[in-house]
């Protein structure tokens, strides 16, 4: 069942300050009260989140990478809380209440005070990320985070109703619940190459972004399958295929891998035909697309080794 996924992109080299990043991020996570415990397993997970960020943005200015890395840690812990809250029987309105304060941080000028520590931690990240970044980029990032929040509520509703979404609905929502669009936004932030809306919304560029999202999202579903099936979570491409096509796990896994690989081929074809704008934008767009390639490969390699997915009882 573990056939290799297609990943024709070169292996990445981590940021030269990766070790310092890991130490700083762990200290920030501890200071903000995000750690559920101080077990070696939990600490290893935090270090693995830092390793992912260091490989995904190897050329970033360190302070910007710090903000990205802290967001990664925030996101992984927050995602687990939302998932575990609804899996343990809480109604979607409980998840919505948790998310409400986070939503307020995105829109408000000051830190929200409810549901600490997540709102306070995000407010700290948000203040740092906002410095010196153009308004159109901040609005885009906010929209993508809000779409993720809406996706968390949708998942909670599905769990309450014991509902497995159709493949079509799932794939559409997966583009938001995976948070990949935020990670693509961080490529701009890390490289100081902010692309105007008319560039990222160009149909061909938008399809490059969507295809890259699908590659990373479906790879995540495959690599996290053990974690999610142990949690009885249905929001996974393999599980959706099992349910919709009435096939066994092995066949669904192979189907999901094939869907992933087809998106890789589609992405490779798309990037041969990028539109042109101006000399500066064209250079930045090329760097942006290269950043997506780097991210996909870094995530592929990280997913194989991270304790988040690869412990015997990965949860």
Curated annotation (Swiss-Prot):
The keyword Metal-binding applies. GO terms for molecular function: metal ion binding; terpene synthase activity. Its cofactor is Mg(2+). A motif (DDXXD motif) lies at residues 79-83. It comes from Sorangium cellulosum (strain So ce56). InterPro entries: Isoprenoid_synthase_dom_sf, Terpene_cyclase-like_2. The keyword Plastid does not apply. Belongs to the terpene synthase family. Binds 3 Mg(2+) ions per subunit. Mg(2+) 2 binds at residue 79. Coiled coil: none annotated. Mg(2+) 1 binds at residue 79. Its EC number is 4.2.3.175. Mg(2+) 3 binds at residues 220, 224, 228. It catalyses: (2E,6E)-farnesyl diphosphate + H2O = 10-epi-cubebol + diphosphate. A motif (NXXXSXXXE motif) lies at residues 220-228. This is 10-epi-cubebol synthase. It comes from the Bacteria.
